[in-house]
Amino acid sequence: GYKNLTNIVSKGFVDGQVMGKPIIQRDWIFERSEGVIVLFTEKSDVGQAMLSGHPEKADSLLQQWQTTFADRVYFAIKRTKRTNEDRFIEQAIRMSNAFDVPIIAHNDVRFLTEDDFEAHEARVCIANSQVLADPNRPRDYSSEQYLKTQDEMTALFSDMPAVIDNTLDL
C-alpha cells in the first residue's frame, strides 16, 4: 500500500501539476489500489456530492470506490467547529448505514498544541500575503486542529463509541 501511495503522489508531482500544485487523478488511485485504504472526508468526491445535495451521485461514487477497494473504504469524520462538519457527519451516517461503510474519527491536525493556533494563523497569513487583523481574510482553520490525545478524541466522540472503536481497529 505504501509503495502504491508514494507512486500516486509522485505521479501527481510529475504529471499532474496545475499552477504548481500536484493534482492526483482518480484513475491513478484505482490503478494502484492494492493495499491502499480510502478515507472519505468532506473534501472527497463522495463528500462533495453529499454536501452539494446530490445523494444519488454520492451513492454512485461510493459504489464505484467499493467495487475496487471493497472493505478498505471508510468515512472519516471530525469535530473541529468548522463549516459543514455537522452536515457531513449526518450524511456519512446515512451512507454508512446504507452501504455498510465504517466511520472513523480524525482531527485534520495542523499544529501540535492548542496554544499553537495563533502561530499557525500567522504562518497562513504570511503564506497568503494577508494580515492577522484583516476581518475579511478567510478563516479556514480552527483552534481545535491540534494533536488531541486518545482520551480527548474519545470524549469528543463519546456519543459515537463505534467511531472510536473503528478508528482503533484501523
PLM region descriptions:
Residues 1-170:
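Phosphodiester-processing cores and adjacent nucleic acid-binding clamps
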